[in-house]
Amino acid sequence: MAFRSQNFLTLGGRVSWAFYVLLLILVVAAGLRLNGVNWDQGFAFHPDERDIYMRSGCMYDLLADAPNALQCGYVLGEPDAEPGLPGVGTLLDKDRSPLNPHWFPLGSILIYILVFFRSIMELFTDMNALDMRYVGRPLSALADLGSVAMVFVLGRKFYGQGVGLLAAAFTALSVIHIQNSHFFRPETFSVFFTLVSFWAMWRMVERKRLRDSAILGLALGLAIAPKVSLLPILAPMFLVYWYRILDDVEGHWSEITSELVQRMFYHAVLAGAIAAGVFFITSPYVILDVGSFLGDIGAQTRMASNAGMWPFTIQYIDTPSFIYQIQQSSVWGLGIPLGVVVWVSIPLTAVLAVLKSDNRRADIFVLAWVVPGFIFLETFEVHFLRYVFPLMPVMIIMGSRMLLWAVRVDRLLSVHLIWGRIDSAMFISRIAIGMVIFVVVATAFYALAFQQVYAKDHPAVTASEWINDNVPKGIDIVSDNHWDEFVPNLYPYNVWQFPVYEPDTIEKMETLAGKLASSEYLVFYSSRPYASAARDPERFPFSIQYYKRLFDGSLGYELDRSFTNYPELFGVSFRDDAISRAGLEQPTPLNPADKSAINFNLGYADDNVVGYDHPTVLLFKNTGLLDESVLAVQ
């Protein structure tokens, strides 16, 4: 087997250079992830994260028997909930227990963690539910920092120390990792413990002890505790137990006995039982309130399987399977150079697994995670970018291996050019080394540019401040943010929300025409309404016409200004463009913002990429003052 047991000590007992390189990588990774913890200024623009904070706040109030705890959020719908610390009988009663979150799309452990930390912090200071972002987001960053370290461990174990260090550096600099670290959601925790479970799988193969299957079960349980997603990990788990069987018979298939298979089966059952136990301990009400658990999981499965079932998934109607996720992860999640490398590395790894035997087991293992996992995800119609996030660390290991393999491949080749034979070690190695340097520098540039998102105020906050400073109080404003986030602090204004996702009817559009005629401004929090309506013309024929007329100026509204916060560094910005994808005309703003010296328009960005921390907020002004009859549906 091509597994290595290098550590950070030299033969002389001194700490090796690799330790200092890894330490530097981790320091850089920590800085990129902890910068801008308060990126939303407390307005909680991520709906899932907000839900976790609010539910943990209500649970804390219920446990503390705080005033009005029974009127808090979800508790209002649970009339039997009993405040205070529960006894055993109350704890086991799903209706009375204050520890039942009554919400299972995500793991209960996330809520319990926040309640635990708040119970400690309340000893020293008063906090509200949204203040827990100062706890949740650093914890998410810490989990992803652990993923950087585990990528090094796995990369070194599979392909050597160089691959481990390069993969750790790429993971530290990957925007998809940096961005997810700024949200208190399950992904960073699940990814970290999934990588730990991969390490435990190899430990089990190498040491061949029952206790190693138990360690594997512990890691698996922690991997699924934040979010139930077990199926893709079964392929690599089956594979490593097959490796165990082959090792016990030294590769002689004919010597495999039923007793050996049965023994390995018991090892696997132990791992599965411990994983289930850990999951149930961290989320006990998935059993005690199994009906709600199955209902929530079923709803999430139906949502992912049917684009357009819920308003926030309409944007995925008719998005091409495989191509969409490859494009979005390459352009926005990793940056184009690294994105190309990691996706190209998949077929190359398959080829090397066939042609070369020295790393074959590692090659088959990483492919067993990435290929079935990606195919499984593409059975869904909804393609949130976060769905492929768990695949990224292993793909980065594969991509790093490919780059360093290219550096060494010159030993097997010679090059002939028209001016004569040259030494391959000088030609191919220099090209390959240059390619490695380019990908590292480009990935680092994009990572630093993305820090701009957290260095400045959120676009919705900037828009709110401008409106409050420049628009007279009490005027009418149309807000096109149905099933979307919001521009905060518009209480001094008469704000009417256009219900775009309600069925298109003449009455709906007549109401809109009346509001447009009487309002002075129209504001979008993000591109979601017009970008998603364009994906379903059969459901929203009138709304699509409204957006076309709005953006081409025929409704008498002109784009006053846009509020953006694109990734930018040294005068180079990376811009997304949802307007073109929606088939709308690009409006010319009355007050254009300053542009960077170099602007890369990278096209449409998935809502997961831009919708939470740097949406494009548009503010239209009613300059035409057209009559309601002119604004009506035509």
Give the role of each language-model region.
Residues 29, 167-172, 199, 220, ...:
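Short helix- or helix-capping micro-motifs
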Residues 1, 23-26, 238-242, 272-273, ...:
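Signature aromatic-anchored transmembrane alpha helix within multi-pass, membrane-resident enzymes
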Residues 35, 52-65, 71-88, 106-114, ...:
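Transmembrane-lumen/periplasm boundary regions of multi-pass, lipid-linked membrane glycan transferases
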Residues 20, 25, 124-130, 151-173, ...:
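Transmembrane-helix signature of polytopic, membrane-embedded enzymes
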Residues 30-34, 402, 429-457, 479-496:
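Transmembrane alpha-helical segments
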